[in-house]
Amino acid sequence: MAAEEEAAPLSGVGWAAGPESAPAGWSVITISVEGSAANLGKGFGHKGGYLCVSTAAPGSAGPVVTDVQVLSDRNPQPAGYSRAPEFPEPRSGVSRKKRLYVRLQPRGAAETAVFDIKLSGKSRAVPQYMKIGEIGSFAIWCKKGALPQCSPPPVPKPRTVSLGLKQLSLADSEQQAPGKPVAQSGSRHASFTLHNSADDGSSIYNLSAMDGVPFTLHPKFERSPKSDSSAILTDLTVKSLADIEKEYNYTFVVERTAAARLPPSIC
């Protein structure tokens, strides 16, 4: 038997008249721990009798077996328990000295469950199993353990946008409101438009590397409001075409000399 956290709990325990009598999905216990045939003998309305179990499907939310009891026919049926089913249905009027009762609970409400059942001789002890009774010449043992709860599928967390990103400008220049003032060229500190992107989560991907980065204009390129444009023009020197040709005259002597040289002779 695998470890409890890897094994599946039992979803049913019943009787089978023979190894071939159990329905689909049920497993018949045909061998005891000593290796002998686990035929519980007559007395159940059939020529023989075997215990059979069904296992809960992985991830199933159906009921699981939380306890099994073997009682005499003189004992009343315990509250919360049901008679173990028999395959095929027994004939009416057949007496049974021992009866098998099973308690089923929803998987979400159960903390422990039965994971396995084994049969052994009455004088044999099965480690890590609990004896629940005797039928015929066999002792019946069950293995209980903590029931691992089925965890719900993970739900992705909603994406949140920080307040700092919401305050950055995420809109293009053509999307700016017409009533908002445009930054003046003479201002030393550039301003950027505040845009609330709470309603537009996709616009965060339009953010460039320079959005929200302040910059300062060098004083050399600033224009004083009191300065006169005529004072700036007095520093300019106007040159004629002849002055420009004389100052930047280039005769290409080096290039012409290099082009006139004959290629070296090949010996």
From Swiss-Prot:
One of its GO terms (cellular component) is cytosol. The keyword Protein transport applies. Its main location: cytoplasm. PROSITE patterns: MABP (PS51498), UMA (PS51497). GO terms for molecular function: SH3 domain binding. Residues 210-259 form the UMA domain. Residues 7-146 form the MABP domain. One of its GO terms (biological process) is virus maturation. Keywords: Cytoplasm, Endosome, Membrane, Protein transport, SH3-binding, Transport. Component of the ESCRT-I complex (endosomal sorting complex required for transport I). Belongs to the MVB12 family. PANTHER family: MULTIVESICULAR BODY SUBUNIT 12A. Component of the ESCRT-I complex, a regulator of vesicular trafficking process. Required for the sorting of endocytic ubiquitinated cargos into multivesicular bodies. This is Multivesicular body subunit 12A. The gene is MVB12A.
